[in-house]
Amino acid sequence: MLTLRRRLGPVLVRELDADLLLLDADSDRIHQLNSTARFIWQRCDGKQSAEEIADLLASEFAVESRVALKDVIETLGKLQALNLLVDG
């Protein structure tokens, strides 16, 4: 069961309509998350598994569970590669 949590530290969060801006002070980079990635990011609390987040995503966005799980795993991988998530 894969669980990740948002990195603690210098990441400022700002809303931009349905998107979310993550301002990473360590890398001096700004990352813009669309509504799907935002939904996933906000649930990365170290308690919910990728599968649980995918179930919530499928319900919220009315998509098939397998599609939601693929999106969650892909998004988690990208966020982890950007050092915005750490192991839960």
Regions found by a protein language model. Give the residues of each.
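Long, low-complexity, charged/polar intrinsically disordered regions in eukaryotic proteins
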Residues: 1-25
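Long, charge-rich, low-complexity alpha-helical segments
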Residues: 16, 26-88
